[in-house]
């Protein structure tokens, strides 16, 4: 598995994923966001942003096939915090790619981008993602009260019940230290 920068050659692969209801419904994507024009606009925005306010990568499987996208968004370099979102082709769920992609992206967030915390907002109806986040040993669950402004922003964006979770730098780096030493 590896993460690579956005480029226009993966437009069809992205559309194949985001056109699926189990992806675009959970992500709250309108039809204009998942057609060719909307997908191209998204990729060009990621390229133009040049990792300033968003750090987004394609997820390639062990055979270098596109299987999803992972993004650090709303990067706040003053408060050293961002929000992470990810999606993977449904037929690749349960194969460990989401965890591997998150681990790699969190490593980048904490060691290269100097962030101190990464938030995950998960819709309560997204049981699969809720359970996946509960399994992550470095995640602190249900922290909306610690980040009221960010929780309000997320609530407005999602317009439905959600849970705000966080990964703190020290927790993740300790997880890596223990994992690498075992």
Task: Briefly describe each language-model feature range.
Residues 24-44:
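Conserved GNAT-fold acetyl-CoA-binding loop/helix
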Residues 25-27, 56, 175:
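Short, hydrophobic secondary-structure boundary micro-motifs
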Residues 30-31, 55, 121, 149:
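Sparse recognition of residues in long alpha-helices and their boundaries
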Residues 44-58:
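A short helix-loop-beta-strand connector motif used in the catalytic cores of GNAT acetyltransferases and
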Residues 1-12, 16-22, 60-182:
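Acyl-donor (CoA/ACP) binding surface of acyl/acetyltransferases
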Residues 18, 27, 46-50:
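Hydrophobic residues in alpha-helical segments
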Residues 22-23, 32, 48, 138:
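Residue-level marker of structural boundaries
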């Amino acid at each position: 598995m590896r993460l690579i920068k956005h480029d226009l050659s993966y437009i069809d692969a992205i559309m194949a994923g985001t056109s699926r209801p189990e992806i675009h419904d959970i992500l709250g994507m309108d039809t204009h966001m998942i057609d060719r024009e909307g997908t191209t606009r998204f990729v060009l925005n990621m390229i133009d942003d040049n990792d300033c306010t968003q750090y987004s990568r394609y997820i390639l499987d062990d055979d270098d096939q596109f299987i999803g996208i992972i993004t650090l968004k709303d990067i706040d370099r003053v408060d050293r915090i961002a929000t992470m979102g990810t999606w993977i082709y449904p037929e690749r769920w349960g194969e460990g790619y989401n965890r591997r992609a998150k681990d790699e992206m969190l490593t980048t967030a904490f060691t290269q981008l100097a962030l101190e915390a990464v938030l995950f907002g998960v819709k309560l109806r997204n049981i699969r993602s809720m359970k996946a986040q509960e399994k992550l040993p470095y995640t602190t669950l249900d922290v909306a009260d610690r980040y009221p402004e960010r929780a309000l922003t997320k609530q407005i964006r999602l317009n439905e019940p959600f849970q705000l979770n966080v990964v703190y730098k020290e927790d993740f780096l300790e997880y890596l230290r223990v994992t690498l030493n075992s």
